[in-house]
Design a protein with these regions (language model features):
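Extracytoplasmic Ser/Thr/Pro-rich, glycosylation-prone low-complexity segments
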Residues: 58-60, 87-337, 367, 372-373, ...
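Beta-strand-rich interaction surfaces with strong enrichment in secreted/lumenal proteins
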Residues: 37-45, 140, 155
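Acidic, glycine-anchored loop motifs typical of Ca2+
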Residues: 1, 47, 144
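Short, surface-exposed binding/anchoring microloops in extracellular/periplasmic proteins
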Residues: 5
Length: 381
């Protein structure tokens, strides 16, 4: 769509401003400005003036809430030069729009972003019976028992432009990329000084893994994903039950424009009950839980929720919610439906002599989950 703009300017100086001729350009994606010159008229001191009109084309791939930057390079007939820029926000952002991007280019899509192709669908992948218990993490059974464990990833995962072969999983609902000895339970803003950097806060809160709770890790070779699942863990303050998982997609198999890995967060049982106040004195930890991401400097990131408050683009989390974290703007969330092979004949051992031809019909069926894709290899020996 084409947008027409003229600027209203105020001269706060003590002298009249001269007439400027300005070129208008932009480096912002999804925004096109053909080479244009505008004129800013002479403005009296403490007076108001206008620029001439210019236009720009905004592509349909632009998201509500995104900030676009327009650059102005201006000069007068006397050789005076002025460089300036103007920020404009696209549309009006609401809970049905993605959160972001941050300064790196990450977005967080939630289940309510139904007008966008990358809207995630909740589809819990339970790894309790097949995953590896993270025994160090599972030692967190109460006050000051916080634990974290370093896990070797089965693939290289790129996050904020940095490549990692390990992650650190904490009992308190977060993952750090690389090795960390932190066990931070006091959740904070994202990005911010609290906790490790980089960080994926899945449900960062003061949690315990006692009373049947546990944390598991599992590599699904068929789906090319690594899953971390906090299963029936409890909030330390109110003993509320929480079950949630983070699914890391192998970037070598699931490509993105930046090469960064994508992440799906799923919440089977979500109870955001820790208000951070224990009755007098300094609160022991931040209010409620933190959900979001931050980079290795701790300066760039996206905060989906903290202290039970949400930005305009975020939908309130609840049971059976999903979040998808990506640098992509188009496409679809990867299909993680589980396939299952069924053969019409399982006795397929044959001996064939020289010059003999044997014909056999075998039917291969996918009896797995709806929309699953079955990959298979047939070999002979």
């Amino acid at each position: 769509r084409t947008i027409y703009i003229d600027n209203i300017l105020l001269n706060t100086g003590t002298l009249p401003s001269p007439e400027f001729t300005c070129s208008v350009t932009t480096q912002s994606p999804d925004l096109n400005i053909s080479e244009q010159l505008i004129t800013i008229e002479t403005i009296a001191n403490n007076g108001i003036g206008n620029s001439s009109e210019f236009n720009m084309d905004l592509e349909n791939t632009a998201f509500n809430g995104e900030t676009k930057i327009i650059d102005f390079s201006c000069q007068t007939e006397y050789g005076f030069e002025l460089l300036s820029s103007e920020d404009i926000e696209v549309g009006t952002v609401s809970a049905v729009d993605p959160l972001g991007p941050d300064n790196y280019g990450y977005y967080i899509y939630d289940s309510g972003d139904t007008n966008y192709s990358l809207v995630p669908s909740y589809d819990w992948i339970d790894i309790e019976d097949v995953g590896n218990p993270l025994n160090t993490v599972n030692d967190d059974d109460g006050n000051n028992q916080d634990d974290s464990q370093v896990i070797n990833l089965p693939f290289t995962f790129k996050f904020y432009g940095e490549e990692y072969q390990q992650i650190t999983v904490c009992s308190n609902g977060w993952i750090s990329f690389g090795s960390s000895d932190l066990e931070s339970f006091r959740n904070d803003h994202l990005p911010g000084p609290g906790g490790p950097s980089p960080m994926l806060a899945v449900f960062w809160d003061d949690l315990t893994a006692d009373s049947g709770g546990a944390v598991y890790g599992y590599y699904d070779e068929l789906l090319h994903v690594y899953i971390v699942q906090w299963n029936n863990v409890k909030t330390y303050e109110d003993n509320s039950n929480e079950s949630f998982q983070a699914i890391l997609f192998d970037p070598a198999f699931y490509s993105t424009p930046t090469g960064d890995g994508e992440i799906l967060l799923q919440y089977e049982d979500f109870n955001n009950t820790s208000n951070g106040s224990y009755g007098g004195g300094t609160p022991l930890h931040g209010g409620y839980c933190s959900v979001g991401i931050e980079d290795h400097w701790g300066t760039t990131g996206l905060e989906y929720t903290f202290n039970n408050t949400y930005p305009r683009a975020a939908r309130t989390l609840s049971d059976d919610s999903a979040l998808f974290i990506s640098t992509r703007k188009t496409g679809a969330v990867w299909n993680l439906a589980q396939a299952e092979l069924e053969l019409s004949n399982t006795d397929i051992n044959y001996e064939i002599s020289d010059d003999e031809i044997l014909t056999e019909n075998i039917t291969l069926s996918n009896i797995g989950e709806e929309e699953s894709i079955l990959s298979y290899t047939i070999s002979t020996s």
